[in-house]
Amino acid sequence: MSRVAKAPVVVPAGVDVKINGQVITIKGKNGELTRTLNDAVEVKHADNTLTFGPRDGYADGWAQAGTARALLNSMVIGVTEGFTKKLQLVGVGYRAAVKGNVVNLSLGFSHPVDHQLPAGITAECPTQTEIVLKGADKQVIGQVAADLRAYRRPEPYKGKGVRYADEVVRTKEAKKK
């Protein structure tokens, strides 16, 4: 059995937590995040800590409490420090540029690809083959990174495409004559 829910989440100074039934709002210097928790989870806020436990009558109470603890911990980290995700473009002529909240990609198609960023997410391109996504919501950053990667996933023979910076692409050997 996982014991993730047994550990409390420490709320640092400068972070405001509001609990309204199952709706939790966490506000910090990087913005405000809101999440609705499962009915099986009971959250208590006291002494700058959030503690989690199951409600009576739910078989999956501890599992849901562990999930809620992990989600709220990510929210606290997001509003204080924020999250970053790096993407690399590998391939001849593959380029990226950021104009406002639109990421412009040249990925070998006959047309450029423009990807609109959701609210709360910023992107920058230190080089033409690198994209850095920043924001407070870990889930949204991961989804945007997955959407950008989906335009041209790394292919298994030369490894060309959009990849995460920490991703290892396994390449196959070319067919022998």
Swiss-Prot record:
HAMAP family: Ribosomal_uL6_B. The lineage of its organism: Bacteria, Pseudomonadati, Pseudomonadota, Gammaproteobacteria, Enterobacterales. This is Large ribosomal subunit protein uL6. GO terms for molecular function: rRNA binding; structural constituent of ribosome. SUPFAM superfamilies: Ribosomal protein L6. This protein binds to the 23S rRNA, and is important in its secondary structure. It is located near the subunit interface in the base of the L7/L12 stalk, and near the tRNA binding site of the peptidyltransferase center. Keywords: Acetylation, Ribonucleoprotein, Ribosomal protein, RNA-binding, rRNA-binding. It comes from the Bacteria. Signal peptide: none annotated. GO terms for biological process: cytoplasmic translation. Disulfide bonds: none annotated. InterPro entries: Ribosomal_uL6-like, Ribosomal_uL6-like_a/b-dom_sf, Ribosomal_uL6_a/b-dom, Ribosomal_uL6_bac-type, Ribosomal_uL6_CS. The modification N6-acetyllysine is found at K44. Belongs to the universal ribosomal protein uL6 family. Part of the 50S ribosomal subunit. One of its GO terms (cellular component) is cytosolic large ribosomal subunit.
